[in-house]
C-alpha cells in the first residue's frame, strides 16, 4: 500500500460554502456589468410583459430605477450572503406610492420573475469556473427569494395603508350623511370609494353582530362592517358603513324590499336585535333624512315590543313622536290627520268614537246614532285616506297617537 492510498479524499465544497468564498475578481465583474444588466433586464420586461408598454414614461423610469438598485444591491449582497435583506428592501423603498397603486401585485410578481429569469440566463456567463457558476446560481436563487418576499411586503404595507385611509374616508362619508353635511366633498369622497353618486341610498341602523365568543370589540365591529360590504358586493350593490357609538350605520345603494334575499343576507351582519330601515333617498346627498329617521327609530323601537326585524322607520311614527321627534309628528299630521280633516269632520268624529269604544262597532254606532254599517263604511274610508286600518291593533294605535298629536296642536312646518 503506497502513501497515496492513505491520503484523505478532499470533500467537495457545498454550494453555500462556494457562495461564502466568491473571488473578488468575480465581484468586480458583477459591479462592472451592473448597469448593463439593469438596462437589459428592463428591455426583457418590455419584450415579455404586454402591460409594461402601457405604463407611463415616469412609471417605466421608476421601474428601471428599482431594477438598477436591485442589481447594485445584489453585488453588495454577494460580498456578505449572510446579511439580512436590508439591501433588497432598499430597492422597494424607492417605489413611488402612485406606482404601487397603478401596478397590481400580480404584475409586480411578473416583473420580478422576468428580471430574475434574465439574471439566471445572463449572470452565469460572468463565471470563469464551475465553482463560480455554482456560486452565482445559488446567489441568484437566494437573492430572488428575498426580492420576491420584499415585493410582497411592500404591497402588503401599501394595501394596509390604503385600507386604513379608505376606512377613514368611508367613516367621514357616513358621518357627513348622518350630520346632514351634503357639501361637494361628500360626492367626491363617495366616488373615490366606488359609490355611484347618482344611485338611490337607503340607511340601516342596528347593533353590529358580536364576535364568535359573544364579544363586542372594535375588531368585531369592523368585521360586521366588512360583512355588510361583502354582502352588498355579492348582490351587485354598494355599501358604506361606520360604527357610531354602539350602532352600526350602513348606507346601501338602491331600495330594500322585505322579501328580498339581499336584505335577509344583510341582516346577518347585525346582532339579533332591532334593525331600523330609513326611507330610500333619491341619491346620497339626500340620504340625511333616511339616516335621521333610522336613528330616531332605533332610539324609539324599544317602545314597540312586537316590532318586526327589520322594521321601517315609518312604522315607528307613534314611538318617535312620543320621544319628541319633530319629523314623526309632522308625518302623523300630514299623512294621517290632514287627509281626514280635508275629508270633513265626520271621519275624525267616527275615528275618535270608535277608538273610545275600544273598537266595538255596535257601541260606536250607538254613540254616533248611526247604523253599524255606516260605521263600517266610514272606517273603510279612513283606511282609504290614511292607509291605516282602525280595526287592526297596530294601525289603531298609530291613528290614536296621530289624533292625540293633532288635538295637542303640535307645531308643524308649513
From Swiss-Prot:
SS bond partners: none
GO molecular function: DNA-binding transcription factor activity
GO biological process, one term: positive regulation of DNA-templated transcription
Highest taxon of source: Bacteria
Biased composition (Basic and acidic residues): 220-230
InterPro entries for the chain: CdaR-like_regulators, CdaR_GGDEF, PucR_C-HTH_dom, PucR_C-HTH_sf
Gene3D superfamilies in the record: PucR C-terminal helix-turn-helix domain
Region (Disordered): 204-230
Family: Belongs to the CdaR family.
Protein name from the UniProt record: Uncharacterized protein Rv2242
Record lineage: Bacteria, Bacillati, Actinomycetota, Actinomycetes, Mycobacteriales
Amino acid at each position: 500500500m503506497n502513501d497515496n492510498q492513505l491520503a484523505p479524499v478532499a470533500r467537495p465544497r457545498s454550494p453555500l460554502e462556494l457562495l461564502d468564498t466568491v473571488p473578488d475578481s468575480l465581484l468586480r465583474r458583477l459591479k462592472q456589468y451592473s448597469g448593463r444588466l439593469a438596462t437589459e433586464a428592463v428591455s426583457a420586461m418590455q419584450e415579455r410583459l404586454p402591460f409594461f408598454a402601457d405604463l407611463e414614461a415616469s412609471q417605466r423610469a421608476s421601474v428601471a430605477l428599482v431594477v438598477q438598485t436591485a442589481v447594485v444591491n445584489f453585488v453588495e449582497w454577494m460580498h456578505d450572503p449572510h446579511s439580512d435583506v436590508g439591501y433588497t428592501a432598499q430597492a422597494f423603498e424607492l417605489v413611488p406610492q402612485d406606482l404601487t397603486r397603478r401596478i397590481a401585485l400580480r404584475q409586480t410578481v411578473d416583473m420580478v420573475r422576468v428580471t430574475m429569469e434574465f439574471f439566471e440566463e445572463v449572470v452565469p456567463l460572468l463565471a470563469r469556473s464551475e465553482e463560480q457558476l455554482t456560486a452565482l446560481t445559488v446567489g441568484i436563487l437566494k437573492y430572488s427569494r428575498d426580492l420576491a418576499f420584499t415585493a410582497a411586503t411592500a404591497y402588503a404595507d401599501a394595501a394596509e395603508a390604503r385600507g386604513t385611509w379608505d376606512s377613514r374616508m368611508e367613516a367621514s362619508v357616513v358621518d357627513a350623511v348622518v350630520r346632514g353635511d351634503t357639501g361637494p366633498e361628500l360626492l367626491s369622497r363617495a366616488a373615490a370609494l366606488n359609490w355611484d353618486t347618482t344611485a338611490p341610498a337607503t340607511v340601516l341602523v342596528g347593533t353590529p353582530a358580536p364576535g364568535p365568543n359573544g364579544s363586542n370589540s372594535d375588531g368585531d365591529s369592523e368585521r360586521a362592517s366588512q360583512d355588510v360590504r361583502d354582502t352588498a358586493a355579492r348582490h351587485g350593490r354598494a355599501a358604506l358603513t361606520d360604527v357610531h357609538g354602539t350602532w352600526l350605520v350602513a348606507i346601501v345603494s338602491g331600495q330594500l324590499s322585505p322579501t328580498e334575499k339581499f336584505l335577509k343576507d344583510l341582516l346577518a351582519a347585525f346582532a339579533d336585535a332591532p334593525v331600523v330601515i330609513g326611507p330610500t333617498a333619491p341619491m346620497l346627498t339626500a340620504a340625511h333624512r333616511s339616516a335621521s329617521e333610522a336613528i330616531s327609530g332605533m332610539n324609539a323601537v324599544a317602545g314597540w315590543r312586537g316590532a318586526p326585524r327589520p322594521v321601517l322607520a315609518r312604522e315607528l311614527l307613534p314611538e318617535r313622536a312620543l320621544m319628541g321627534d319633530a319629523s314623526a309628528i309632522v308625518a302623523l299630521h300630514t299623512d294621517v290627520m290632514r287627509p281626514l280633516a280635508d275629508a270633513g269632520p265626520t271621519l275624525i268624529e267616527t275615528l275618535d268614537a270608535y277608538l273610545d269604544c275600544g273598537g266595538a262597532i255596535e257601541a260606536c254606532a250607538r254613540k254616533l246614532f248611526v247604523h253599524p254599517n255606516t260605521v263600517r263604511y266610514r272606517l273603510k274610508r279612513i283606511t282609504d285616506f290614511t292607509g291605516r286600518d282602525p280595526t287592526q291593533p297596530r294601525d289603531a294605535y298609530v291613528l290614536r297617537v296621530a289624533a292625540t298629536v293633532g288635538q295637542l296642536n303640535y307645531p308643524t312646518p308649513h
